[in-house]
Amino acid sequence: MLPALAWGAVPAPTEPAGPPTPASRPAPERERTHGNGVYHTLLGNLSINAPQDTLGGAEYDAAQSLFEAGLFDSAAAEFGRFAARFPRNLFLNDAIEHVLLIRENREPGDEALRLYAHAVALRGAGLPDSAASVAETGLSRFPTARIRYHWQYLLAEIARERGDHGTAIRYALVIADSTSKSRLAPYALKLAGDESIAMGEDPAKALRLYQALLERYPASPLAPPVRARVLEIRKRL
């Protein structure tokens, strides 16, 4: 769960009432244009239950385009306005995460943040290999940058999509380490657990990862589906 924001007008991130379910109709246009947002991807394809869930798609697209172009001040302002105007939109958490990401990683030249934005743009354009190369460059050049966990999560997701379960788990476990204090840690724990199952490892390993998520992040929006999966695994053991 994202921490409370200090900038007033934007509402707190919403959480789904239960496990995510597959979308019952085609994805919004912005997903086909830019790819899923960070938190929308992490939470899975939530059901679209009302027009408010997708209202504001053009505004989100505009903010995302500014971010990918490296216009971070403008992007943060647009994401903030989007979050304030469209609190029901499924990309709300993603917009808030962008604002936090920009605020936490501004520095002279914004080189590390620009590399991340470029990697995101490449992945959204359907160029995962190029995106991975940029993320790896970022990790090599800025190994201690705060944004390194976002590069690593991007690499974990790309590895998962390739079917490279071991690499996906390796990156995810770095993020999930309790010392990282990354907002992506609960999502990394779930990814590592899912990939452990996908590669046919002992279910007890995935169970330990899922239980760690539930113990460390009980209020996470991932908790309900993970809790259900834990029950399923325990029945089979």
Describe each region flagged by the PLM.
Residues 1-6:
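Bacterial N-terminal signal peptides
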Residues 7-237:
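Acidic, polar-rich low-complexity tracts and alpha-helical solenoid repeat scaffolds
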